[in-house]
Regions:
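N-terminal localization/anchoring segments of enzymes in phospholipid and broader phosphate metabolism
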Residues: 1-341, 359-363, 375-399, 403-523
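Hydrophobic alpha/beta core scaffold segments
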Residues: 366-370
């Protein structure tokens, strides 16, 4: 290659005597500190929203002075230097680590295009960009097609642009009265914020519940809150005792007869068009009047800081979500060997949930779980969790969706909550029932493909260890994320350039090897 790269810290280390020319340099190190990043918000909440925002700004400044947890260096420290740091930073020997690799690899992403020309191609994934959703009609407006039936997107295989288009239409539609949305994390130069500002400019009521306590996004959210506030949006900062972690968007409008109608969007992931290309999430858009009414009540109650409300369709933490999940598990327990639970989430830590899962296993319920992160329940423990299987999938994309299937695909819920105590009783979360049969089928297919993953999937054994999945000679290797990418490519609708709205969508039918996967579902 005719190009070479060198890290800035390496230059500084090599020229440290020039930088500190007034000192005699005996030894130099590349070093970084990891601090405790947890902030105590409870003592800094003020009555007025603007005061709270100012308090958050002050609180963030404390983060640079929080306790050091570890020290990383590029070579072992001399004894005197180490003792000096131990004393000044109030840390012990076990908190020092030596690395020969860079401490922060974030810069590699910026070099990707340069590296492709000089590195082994096998080091890179094949390029992939999100496709138009299978259920999205490119020949119709988002409003029109959501009014016809519910629409589902599975990121990053299907593009978040369809949701952004919905917001854009809402901003321009003269019949739209208001847009309400909960925000936890946003992209840099957020298109969501751009559409909300356009809506406000066009006279819509825009209400944003913006959580300032989203870890590491506090400063970004403070800045966005000011931008939205300056343009006349109503900004709420969640509730005093609970982080608002739910992903809910509600568009209220009038139909031709003057009736109030709703379009609701509930998802498992953030309104972040950047991470939607890296995180595997699910997003439902629906005109279901009952769900719309629930979402409207949800925003009204959050405005009043009332989190203890029972809704007709949606389940919300911290009041009804946990008890409802336990009740649905109990229903499957009563079925005995005919009971089924198929669950997907990031982590499982709640004691009552774990106890109920164990009861389900002992009653003969077939329990399948896809848990990417922490699992505090051990499967396959004789006499306790014999009927529980747990798989973790770690691949190209971060598995972030939460799906809860009760019975033989009888009830399916998606939403923002994990089976963790913090999500179930210490946060405001929302999960939503899936009513549309075609969407149920799509989610079940997604879950089944994940369960068949024998490439990136690992099973947790009775000791809590992760094991590779054994593959017999001749057995198909299935990478669930690659399978979803292939489905998205083959199923994306194609717009007819000669057609106008309301013409039937053309869909490519090139399933090829994915037919094998479907056959496996039927076995």
């Amino acid at each position: 290659s005719d190009k070479e790269w060198i890290r800035t810290e390496s230059i500084l280390k090599a020229k440290v005597d020039k930088v500190f020319s007034f000192y005699k340099v005996k030894k130099s190190y590349i070093m970084n500190l990891h601090r405790n990043m947890d902030l105590n918000y409870e003592d800094h909440r003020e009555d007025e929203a603007i005061d709270y925002k100012m308090q958050m700004k002050k609180l963030l400044k404390k983060r640079t002075r929080l306790q050091v947890l570890r020290v990383n260096t590029d070579s072992p420290l001399e004894k005197t230097t180490k003792e000096f740091l131990k004393d000044r930073l109030n840390i012990k020997d076990h908190q020092f680590f030596t690395y020969t690799s860079p401490f922060n690899m974030g810069y590699v992403f910026k070099l990707e295009n340069n590296l492709k020309s000089v590195c082994d191609p096998n080091l890179f994934y094949d390029s992939f960009s999100p496709k138009l959703g299978q259920m999205i009609d490119p020949n119709k407006s988002m409003f029109e097609q959501i009014e016809e039936r519910d629409r589902l997107l599975i990121y990053p295989y299907e593009d978040i642009d369809s949701f952004l288009k919905l917001l854009e239409e809402a901003a321009e539609n003269p019949d739209v009265i208001s847009i309400k949305i909960t925000i936890y994390r946003l992209a840099k130069n957020s298109k969501v914020v751009k559409n909300l500002l356009k809506a406000r400019e066009n006279g819509k009521e825009v209400t944003v519940i913006l959580e300032l306590r989203a870890r590491f996004d506090e400063e970004s959210n403070i800045n966005y809150s000011q931008t939205l506030y300056d343009e006349g949006c109503t900004i709420l900062y969640g509730t005093e005792d609970y982080k608002v972690h739910s992903k809910v968007c509600l568009i209220t409008y009038k139909d031709a007869s003057g009736n109030i109608k709703y379009i609701s969007q509930i998802g498992t992931g953030n309104y972040n068009e950047s991470t939607s290309k890296q995180y595997a999430d699910i997003s439902l858009m629906t005109a279901h009047p009952g769900i719309g009414k629930d979402c409207n009540n949800f925003f009204n109650h959050i405005n009043l800081e009332n989190v203890n409300h029972i809704y007709e369709n949606i389940l919300a933490a911290p009041y009804t979500l946990k008890s409802s999940i336990l009740e649905k598990m109990e229903r499957e327990i009563k079925k005995g060997k005919d009971g089924k639970l198929f669950l997907k989430c990031n982590s499982v830590t709640d004691k009552e949930i774990i106890k109920k899962l164990s009861e389900a296993s002992q009653a003969g319920v077939d329990v399948r779980m896809i848990v990417r992160g922490i699992s505090c329940i051990r499967p396959q423990v004789e006499g306790y969790t014999d009927n529980i299987e747990i798989k973790s999938i770690v691949g190209r994309y971060l598995e972030h969706a939460r799906v809860y299937i009760f019975g033989d695909n009888e009830e399916i819920y998606i939403g923002s909550a994990d089976l963790m105590t913090r999500n179930l009783i210490r946060r405001v979360e929302v999960i939503i029932p899936i009513y549309d049969p075609a969407i149920k089928e799509k989610i079940v297919e997604y879950m089944n493909i994940q369960w068949l993953d024998n490439t990136k999937g690992r099973m947790i054994n009775s000791q809590g260890k992760y094991e590779k999945i054994s593959v017999t000679p001749g057995e198909d290797l299935i990478n669930s994320q690659e399978a979803m990418m292939e489905l998205a490519k083959n199923r994306q609708p194609k717009a007819d350039p000669n057609s106008k709205k309301n013409k039937k969508v053309k869909v490519e039918k090139k399933e090829k090897w994915l037919d094998k996967i479907r056959q496996l579902f039927k076995k």
